[in-house]
Swiss-Prot record:
It comes from Paraburkholderia phytofirmans (strain DSM 17436 / LMG 22146 / PsJN) (Burkholderia phytofirmans). PANTHER family: 5-OXOPROLINASE SUBUNIT A, UNCHARACTERIZED PROTEIN YBGL-RELATED. GO terms for molecular function: 5-oxoprolinase (ATP-hydrolyzing) activity; ATP binding. Pfam families: LamB_YcsF. This is 5-oxoprolinase subunit A.
Amino acid sequence: MEIDLNADLGEGCGSDEALLDLVSSANIACGWHAGGANAMRDCVRWAVQKGVSIGAHPSFNDPENFGRKEMDLPASDIYAGVLYQLGALSAIAQAEGGRIAHVKPHGALYNQAARDSKIADAIVSAVHDFDPSVAVFALANSGLVTAARNAGLVAVEEVFADRGYRADGSLVPRKEPGALLDDEDEVLTRTLAMIREQRVQAVDGQWVSLNAQTICLHGDGPHALAFARRIRGALQDAGIEVHAAGAARA
């Protein structure tokens, strides 16, 4: 049994280099919600040194809201914005001896793509035109998974052990009760259940089936790094191997 562990990096949380010792895939911010050229270069260099798969973490151009404000943009704008961010990170990766292996949208772009086919198709088109061998990390069971596979791309289905789920498989919005789980023992139990049983309990008590191929470890917060170490240790104790997912392993 195996799983991919990913983390969002280059966002100013300060623990990027240490997190890269724990994860198999890194989603690197491309400057539109956080980060910048130097942060991107640092994260890419560390990822190459540690053998971690490099991924782009594009977003809406919204640093004021950390990319978490929903936007209604033309598909052409979304396509161009994603392609622009991929190009920036790709240039840095090439200079450091690496390459982009996957793309995981950030924040509102990620959440809207899960339910809005126009946005999902625009992201997928940008990834396909950039490099059709690049995988797309998407919320499990979401429209972005479907769009990626329809375009012939590898879709890697992502789950969140520390986020609340609705019965339809969507994440509870961050501002609503039950959105974020802070009981570490509960999160560890959910993590193992997602991998072994391929399901998660929603906030209303219903069980949601999902295909857990990669799990996001959040790096923001005072105890995030220590908790990430607990999760990695629990997986090791359970005999679950950690490997980069999908096309990211190529």
